[in-house]
């Protein structure tokens, strides 16, 4: 990945994390085991295995606590992010590749440098048009990803 693209990606992730955690400040996870759950402080990519997440899709969980989770998702060309809903707020940053995203009734082609905001409980999914990587940020964390 080009140095300039990587810097832009890291900057965007910081903005996304700030925005998501700030927007959900009044919706804190109640005192529960999830609230006390957290990842290691440093997650080193080459030390973290990719987990299967569907045909042609794999993910790495890159950090989390009860309030927020950062996930890197790798897609092969033609892979489908099956349409689904969840109660989490989601923001997605396109690191590389090209995707056709559907969010609610809207459909748009997105590519490196683009972002997507997905409200809770909105049907969304994607088709990978060119191999790529997405970075998803969820608030609160996706406890179902830890099982």
Label each region the model flagged.
Residues 23-67, 147:
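A short, N-terminal "cap"/entry segment at the start of jelly-roll beta-barrel domains
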Residues 106-120:
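Short acidic-glycine-tyrosine-enriched beta hairpin
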Residues 95-96, 111-112, 130:
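A cytosolic small-molecule/anion-sensing beta-strand core signal
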Residues 120-144:
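Ligand-binding loop in jelly-roll beta-barrel domains
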Residues 54, 69-85:
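Conserved short histidine dyad/triad with adjacent acidic residue
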Residues 11-21:
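Bacterial N-terminal signal peptides
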Residues 2-11:
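Bacterial N-terminal signal peptides that target proteins for export
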Residues 74-76, 85-101:
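Short, conserved beta-strand element in jelly-roll/cupin
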């Amino acid at each position: 990945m080009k140095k300039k693209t990587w810097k832009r990606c890291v900057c965007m992730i910081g903005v996304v994390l700030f925005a998501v955690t700030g927007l959900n400040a009044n919706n804190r996870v109640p005192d529960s085991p999830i609230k006390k759950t957290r990842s290691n402080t440093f997650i080193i990519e080459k030390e973290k295995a990719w987990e299967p997440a569907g045909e042609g899709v794999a993910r790495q969980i890159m950090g989390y606590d009860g309030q927020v989770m950062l996930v890197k998702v790798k897609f092969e060309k033609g892979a489908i992010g099956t349409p689904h809903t969840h109660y989490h707020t989601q923001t997605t940053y396109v690191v590389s590749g090209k995707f056709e995203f559907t969010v609610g009734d809207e459909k748009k082609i997105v590519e490196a440098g683009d972002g997507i905001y997905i409200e809770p409980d909105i049907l969304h999914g994607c088709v990978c048009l060119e191999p790529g990587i997405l970075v998803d940020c969820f608030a609160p964390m996706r406890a179902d990803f830890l099982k």
